[in-house]
Amino acid sequence: MKSPFSRFFGGGSKTEPIVKNEVEQAEAVHTAEEVIKLPIDQIVPNRFQPRTIFDDEKIEELSRTIHTHGVIQPIVVRKTSENQYEIIAGERRYRAMKKLQWTEVPAIVRNLTDKETASIALIENLQREELTAIEEAVAYQKLLELHELTQEALAQRLGKGQSTVANKLRLLRLPDEVQQAILQRKISERHARALIAIKDQPLQLEVLQQTVDNDWNVRQLEEQIQAILHPVTDEQESVPKKAKPKRKAISKDVRIALNTIKQSLTMVTKSGITVKTEEEDTEEYYQITVKIPKKKKV
């Protein structure tokens, strides 16, 4: 039988997207193959699985579906030793059946290499919307390494734009703390891409924490980053360069605090309350005086 993902392994057109038909082939051809029952304790997850976090609620939902309707599609495995099988496709089904405490599961056994197993696992998961941007980026990186492809060639074979692949891969340059925030869905991919502009890692992590704590949207984060990287005050704009008084440099964490205060005042103003502010920048401190009328003017 023709190997699944043969075009990814060098045969066929290198520009034709392979994801849809060959992934379907990888699981759908089970009608022509033998489905056997395997002891669930002999099955292990795929070591090439790009997904690092499984949604317990969705696994529970899948468990209820399987309990009611049974397993419509068997999992696909390969034999790795006398009493061990590695999952090629269907880990969510495996986890759901394990949750139901099944002792045996329906499976199709395939004879595949590490390279083929990894590719099927990676591409199967790339079809699913549940992957985080980091998991997707890791999958792209592994496929590039496995098949020694350029980003352009990988994008063509997956039917995606090269910029999509490049933008995802760029996320892997971020510190582990930022990547973990994406994996845990504390920030979005767009948040992470905005953070790339900050080259100073301690500052980058500080802004990350501020983003999570204040629940900033992408636009708010971009405004904060702009203010940090290119701080310009009204006073500085109106005073000629020669007349600028010498001030102590404002630390980056103070800038973040000031921007947060100003952002809060803007929100108060938008709610319909008139707010008067006075700002004073001295050698020792930065003072903001806020005046809120007790009575609304008629």
UniProtKB/Swiss-Prot annotation:
Q: One GO molecular-function annotation for this sequence?
A: DNA binding
Q: Name the Pfam families on file.
A: HTH_ParB, ParBc
Task: Tell me the keywords, alphabetical order.
Answer: Cell cycle, Cell division, Cytoplasm, DNA-binding, Septation
UniProt keyword Transferase present = no
**Where is the protein localized?**
Cytoplasm, Nucleoid
One example of a Gene Ontology biological process annotation: division septum assembly
* GO-annotated cellular components: chromosome; cytoplasm; nucleoid
* Keyword Nucleotide-binding part of the UniProt annotation: no
CDD domains per the record?
SPO0J_N
Q: Which residues bind DNA?
A: 152-171
Q: Which family does it belong to?
A: Belongs to the ParB family.
Which NCBIfam families has this protein been placed in? nucleoid_noc, parB_part
**What name does UniProt use for this protein?**
Nucleoid occlusion protein
